[in-house]
Amino acid sequence: MEEDKIRALTTTLKPNETQAQKLLKAHIAVLVSALGGIDKTSEIVPPPYKLGHDALACLKDIKRWIRAVDERQHNYEVALACAESGLVQNDLIIILCQWDSQMQNKKQKTDTMVRNKTAMEKIMLSCLEILVLLTWPMEFGTNLSENQKLLFAQVRKIQVLHKKHILTYNDGQVLKAVIRLALPVIAKTRIDREPRDNQILRLVLYFTRNLLAIEPENDSISTKTNNKRATPSSNLPNGVSPDDISINNLLRVFKKNKVLMLLLTITGSINSEFEKDLFNEICLESVYLLIKGLEAKDVLVNKPTSTTKMNTKTAAAAATTATTATTTTTNTTSSVDISATTPLQPLSSTVGLQLQDLLNTEAKKRQSQKQHIATRHGKFGTLLSIRSADANSYVVSGEEALINSNGTMDKLDKSKTWKMKNHFTYDSDEFVKTNSPIYLNAQGRQILSYFIEEFLSGGCFNNLIESMTSKLTSQLEYSLIDELTQASYFYTIAWFLNYQREQITLSGLQTFDFGVVRAALSEVNFILIVAYFRDSHQKRLWNSLHVAMICFKELLHISNSIFGKKRARTTNDDTIGDDEQYEIDRELAEGIIRKLFSFNEFLNTLVQVPQIAYKHSPRFLAESIRVITIILKSFESFAKEDLQLYVQTKRRRNKKKQQRINELDRDTESKLSTAIYESDEELAQENLREVTRERKLNFQATEVRFFHQNVVTTYIEYMSRFEDLTHEDIKMCLTYFHKLFVVRKDYNGLFRLDFMQLIYKLRNHLPKGSPIRLKVDEFIYYFMKKFKLAITRFPNPLEILFPRFEETRFKHYLSTGELYQLDTAVDPRAIRNLNKEVIDNDYNDAVDNDNNNDNYNEDDEDGIAFEIEANPEAADNHAYDLDRLDELESQLTNYQSRNKNRSSLEKGIAKKRNSRKKSTKTSKVNSDGGDSDDDDDDADAAAAAKAHRKRRVPRDLLFEEPKPLRSAEFINDSDDESDDEKNAEFFAREERLRQLLNQTGNITDAQKLEEFKKVWQQYSKTGGSIMQDAVANAVKEVSLFISDGDDDDDDGNGNENQKGKRKRTRDEADDFDGVSTILDSVQSQVLDNGSSQGNFASDAEVYHASSNTSDTELETNKRAKIDDAEEKEDEGKGEKEEDDNADEDEDEDEDVDGEESFPVVHHKKKRAIISDDEE
């Protein structure tokens, strides 16, 4: 009785296998069996593959299993079951190749095939879908489940096996069959294509991408704790050789089956015939995987097939190894043919190239050993005893210890047990290198070179980059782009820029033609690279940062090569054309530099990256060293060319949301702030100088930042691997040290024990007589000469054991032996801030003392002295003509008048404002919307200046010549004693007026003034002769109402000014509801006082002074205390004058003419104080 196979599959378990896994594999095996198989009954040789009755349904079921288990449950069980059943190599590949052969051979086409054409295409598409799912590249990361991590290595080997079968079966006919599915889609126009057609084309491109992405894992080393022996584990499955999956075989198969042509077709028409959003990312990744791990010069330069002398046996062994691995490498002719049908050459195969590298490494080691091997007379054994200074003895054996003292100490060091920490991690090479080294033979080089030339000349590169640029600049799509896509974009740009630059260098052309890569040099691309560089550093994405450094380095190389180009000397006919081309190239180079070095934050990132580079992989470290080298070289070129760069410094806004000025709308506040700010000429010029100083890039100051001790440590770490470096790399490090030590004369920067030991080992390693060793010897001689001088000054230099501190005092002390003293130069800005702070402190103390007094003495000069100090500009008139301030001031006045709180003041007492609270509030209000610089001192000064300007009365109220504000007048008070006397007189009169205003109210608009005048005229007519005389004397005494004859002494301009000011006063006034109340109070005072002209005049003076905008009225207010000032001035002479009202008018007219500039400033002070108190 036969055994049931299904029962055996479901009951017999393998080690570490669950029942569910066994059942799943049984289901997949049943589906694969029902799919079809080889028809052994057919007479055709080889026998064809015969599909089952429900082949399409079986393929759909397998696809459902993959998505349901592997994708949704994060497992690889279905993929392993398909590999165990041989689905790919025994079914899918054969089905696709057989269908392609039938479609290609027109003679075998029958009516049955034509009738079943649609069904066969569905089956082929289902096969393609399963192939794409099973070959989808995997990445080992934290997002994998525990089961996926356990099966990751096994599934990776299975994918490598699938790649081998796809490329080797009928010389890659599977790719040809897949492209045949895409041909009908490509033949359609863009309008006629349906979404299903685009999906078919995407499947074809994804399948191509998967083949490029599949590569074996890194060689892993497993160390056992018992014997500490390292056992390498194979990363290739059984039956797969490196040549089967190498880039050479891949390029050959792609060329033969028109895959490269398909890629060129789609990328060349990606913006016209194909949707860029659907195909640009896939095409970009395919191109990126083609060039990943390759150098541009390796594609351009044809290297010889053998660089070392290989004997016949070695070559035959290499050929045998290569031919046994694959059946396609049987032809061993030495001729090179770019035809895709020509098999790979054994001597130039992957195995042969690996053998050549091993032989080259062995030759280098033998050459280094020959320098230290003793003669044949010394090979009889050696035993040395070394006694140290502390009487300890060390024994060294071997003839290597007899060569020199260096060999003796090295032999002694090798006998020690070192526990060296691994200072670097391989966390930054994922996007720039492959898991296994790439060896490109002659045939693969020619195929790839032809593809790249077609890719550039056909405009495919520009189309692809432009489509990806629009996607990266879109905010919605940018969030969906992963890290790999961004890295592939910038790495592709860097690689093709390097390719074009190397091609120009090798061709010897005098012009720099970068038209084929113009999309990479666009302005948008520069913004993207700067943002990508900065974001990668901030997010600590070291793989992305590595790619960003490569792209940034290539851009600098292009600019530096153009700057290094000399103007060609030609005949007169060619001079004009060459000069134009030279200017075009120079403009390109300057544009690159200006766009790259346009942000101060990006410069800070460039300085910070090399300081931590030694903690990462050697490739990352080498790339950072090259970036620093090209930056320093570029700075030298810029300095020679006198190129001026300006760096933009970002201004940060205050975090607190500050209140706007008097709750005005934003537009009005912006106009007011701009107008007042632009009125200050000196401050505007100072701010302009500051912006220019901040933005202009100082090459010397920026260059110093790249000589930080952490950067020096990076160079030392890089050169410590001198055994793996070329002479060019060593020379690059020596150039940096020479610039630091010799050019900049920063001796203490290299007085380090690790550097001394490194330079000594490097000298012994380099071969004698080589040019690089001569340079090392010269540097060591100069270094030791300076070190001896330094050691005499510091007998016990402990500083050489550690890196130097970068503080200025330490650097100064180590360089000169003297203590560092701060610069005693006086900063004018500091003096201005200090004086202002002192004035504010005195002002606050005076306010605190005055707040304790209930009453205010108008004759107390000490009590009002603080207002003179708080307003040092009181003695000057700084009236400027500003536009649109009349309208803005009217809005401001309207708001203040509506929000006055008249209950805060008692009648008869004028309280001073609380300066501490008000000043804080005013500063907050006036600083709204202002930007602050990075410097805290500049921010404070700017905020104080803005607050002072916004509190200033608009200067277009007077038509006078503008007078610039001087710093000395802003800080220091006037030395003239007469100014103090006049100020005291004015503030005494002002306080008196304020008391009267508080008692009777205010006149704030023209309407109320007119009503007030009518009431007074009515009183003068109906009140009798006494009332009429009192009103006439009050008008004459106080100049309450301006008549035509009052301005006889003024010139025409003065009359026009006064008319203009009265007109603006009426425009600025707003409605006030308390007119009737004021008139009642005036009427009661007039009736009570009767014929008292003095009291009536005082009341009139109160109403007159309350008009906040008339200068003539303010001039009249000052006449109240002129007698007191004259008495103080003539006190020494003993003359006291008692004049009547007519004599006072004559004397006061003279004083008013001399004090013409006072009313505006004091009027501003009065308004500010009154509005604050009432508020």
From Swiss-Prot:
Keyword DNA repair among record annotations: yes
Acidic residues bias: start-end ranges: 930-940, 1044-1053, 1137-1156
Cell compartment(s), UniProt: Nucleus
Segments of skewed composition (Basic residues): 910-921
Biased amino acid composition, Basic and acidic residues: 954-966
Biased composition (Polar residues): 1078-1096
A GO BP entry: replication fork arrest
Domain of life: Eukaryota
GO cellular component, one term: replication fork protection complex
Region (Disordered): 894-982, 1043-1175
GO molecular function, one term: DNA binding
Keywords assigned: Cell cycle, DNA damage, DNA repair, DNA replication inhibitor, Meiosis, Nucleus
InterPro entries with a match to the protein in the record: Timeless (IPR044998), Timeless_N (IPR006906)
Protein's job: Forms a fork protection complex (FPC) with CSM3 and which is required for chromosome segregation during meiosis and DNA damage repair. FPC coordinates leading and lagging strand synthesis and moves with the replication fork. FPC stabilizes replication forks in a configuration that is recognized by replication checkpoint sensors.
Family stated for the protein in its record: Belongs to the timeless family.
PANTHER family: PROTEIN TIMELESS HOMOLOG (PTHR22940:SF4), TIMEOUT/TIMELESS-2 (PTHR22940)
Subunit and partners: Component of the fork protection complex (FPC) consisting of TOF1 and CSM3.
Protein name: Topoisomerase 1-associated factor 1
Organism name: Lodderomyces elongisporus (strain ATCC 11503 / CBS 2605 / JCM 1781 / NBRC 1676 / NRRL YB-4239) (Yeast)
